[in-house]
Every structure is written in structure tokens, then in C-alpha cells.
Amino acid sequence: MSAFVNIDAQRIPVALSHQPYEVVIGGEGLRGVGKELRRAGLKEGIKVLVVSNADVAEPYGDLCLQSLKESGFRPTLLVIEAGEDQKTPVSVALIHDAAYEAKLERGSLMVALGGGVVGDMTGFAAATWLRGISVVQLPTTLLAMVDAAIGGKTGVNHPGGKNLIGAFHQPRLVLIDPSTLKTLPEREFRAGMAEVIKYGVIGDSALFQLLEGIQELDTPSQLHQDLLEKILERSALAKSRVVSSDEREGGLRAILNYGHTFGHVVETLCGYGNWLHGEAVAIGMVAVGELAVLRQSWSRDDANRQKSLIAKAGLPIAWPKLDPEEVLYTLQGDKKVKDGKLRFVIPTGIGNVEIKNDVSREEIRKCLSELS
């Protein structure tokens, strides 16, 4: 057995033809990141730029750096601001500046240690530095663990919309240390639970039922470690299966945008940073659930089950007061628009969805009227 194999970790393959990688859950966690990088084929002696934010770097930065040094890497730590309002080209330029100062080469590595914003910006910086260097994702929020860190989507926001500037850039490794959730603010944990619920709706009715059976969903301290790891594993497996079959969102991967079309409108019109991404997605899922009822795609009972589970997770379910015409205008600028037509992921039952390009503006107006 290889000296770099961690027998206690759960390993989920992301089976891409050109660059397969693993999502590793548990094991030694951040203490074993250096070993896991060696196992993934990264050579000792290479320069590593670890990008993090202050709230994460304080408890975990030194631990990560020590593990990297013990495995023969040469790490440097960069601490950045990581609110959604900081997810801009200017912030990525700061990472580029640090890469220049650290003299990163094409064989060097960037490591994202933090939540989804850190992961998105670091991934995009890696994709664009020297026309692309390797990146590793070390997610420390629930949302990043189950969604943002897996699949290679990177990017930053534009005043006209969320994630309009970006690239697909797959990581060499995703390492999930569930113990980092102990220091995660409860609001952030709840936001991540929105993405977990999403997986239940789009393709895993058993996961949805599992979540329905849990009495307390809104804080990690209420979940037994084994149950938490099961939720992480099922969610990561759901994401990896979709990404493995459709890396660049040519077809099936679009189902991962469930709740995001309306959710991105909420983020854009309410201002980045006023809602956490997962909170906006939760509102978006409730909204598209109502749209599905109006289209008779699924039952009112299914819509109510979804809304109840979202509420139990401590997430918002009320649509904010927004001008319907502004909503329609913002939807038209969404990157998921195809041939000028609005594209939505519509649920047809718990565990099943369809991608629809025929949603009319009048249907959206009626849906917004029902929500308000």
C-alpha cells in the first residue's frame, strides 16, 4: 500500500477523460493535505500559493502550511477578503500579484482554503495565471464542500450578473475536512444546506427523505458526525456523477442550476452580500417550485414538502419585494439564456427535474404575482 494512501477517507472519483480526480472526505483532513497532494501526483519541491480569508486562515492556515512543508512543498499564504461583494476581477488581480511575487511557475500550484468565494476566485486565478496552473480545493463551508469546490466552475461577478466572468478549470484534488464545519457560523451552515436539499430534489429522493427525517437541520452541532459525513458523501457523489457525464454544462449538468436562475436574480437585484448564495438559492427553489405548480409539472404537495424542508433548515422562503419587470430584465441577462429563451430547471417530482426552454414571460409574471 502506498505511503500516501489514507485508508479512513471516503474517496469519490470525478471520472473526467482528460483529468480525473478525487473528492476525499474525512481521513486526516487538513493535517493530511500534503500527503494527499503527493498521492494525487504533485511533486515535492513545487511552489504552492495558499489563498484563504482571515476567518479561515486563523484556525487552519498554519495547519495547512505545516502539512505542505512536511510533504516537501514550498507554500506561501495569501489572506484576502472573501465576501460576495469582493468576488471581482480586482480581487483576482490581487491573487495574480501574489503569484508574481511568489514566482509561481507552470508547474506550481494554487490552493483554495475557504468557502465558495475563495474557491471561485482562486480557481479563476489559477486558470488565468500563465494560461493555467493546477489548483486544489480545500473547502471549509458546507456549500463549498457539496457544490462549489467540485466540478471546475470558477469565476467572478460582473455588475450585470453573477459569475459572468469565469472559466472551467478542474482541480487536481478536492479535500473535505468535516471538522472545519465546527467553526462555521450557523448562518453559513444553513446556506450550504440549500445545496444539499437541491440534490434531493433534482435526483435523490432518498436523500430528500433522509433530510425530512432529521429533526434539527439548521446547525452542525445537532448532526451526528456519521450522519453529517453521509450527507456530505451523498451530495458529493451526486455532483460528481453529473460533472463526470457533462463537464461543461452541455446538457445534463444544467440540472445543477436548479433554484439558481431565480436565486441569481435575488443576489443581483438585492445587492451582492445582502443574501448568502445558499439563501438566495433557497428562495429560488421555492420560486421555481411555484412556477412548476403553475405549469402543472409537479403537485402542490411536492412544492409544500420542498418549502417545509427549506424552512426547517432555517432558510428563507419568502420572495423579496422586487419589480417584476426588473426581474425579467435581469433574467434575460442570465448566462443560462439560450437563443434568447429563458431556460429553467423545472421539478416534476421529488427526485426528478426537466430542463425547459419554453417558459414564457407571462408565466414568470404570474409566478411572481403568486409569490408576492
From Swiss-Prot:
GO terms for cellular component: cytoplasm. One of its GO terms (molecular function) is 3-dehydroquinate synthase activity. The keyword Phosphoprotein does not apply. Zn(2+) binds at residues 195, 260, 277. CDD domains: DHQS (cd08195). NAD(+) binds at residues 116-120, 140-141, 153, 162, 180-183. Keywords: Amino-acid biosynthesis, Aromatic amino acid biosynthesis, Cobalt, Cytoplasm, Lyase, Metal-binding, NAD, Nucleotide-binding, Zinc. GO terms for biological process: amino acid biosynthetic process; aromatic amino acid family biosynthetic process; chorismate biosynthetic process. It is an enzyme of class 4 (lyase). Catalyzes the conversion of 3-deoxy-D-arabino-heptulosonate 7-phosphate (DAHP) to dehydroquinate (DHQ). This is 3-dehydroquinate synthase. The gene is aroB.
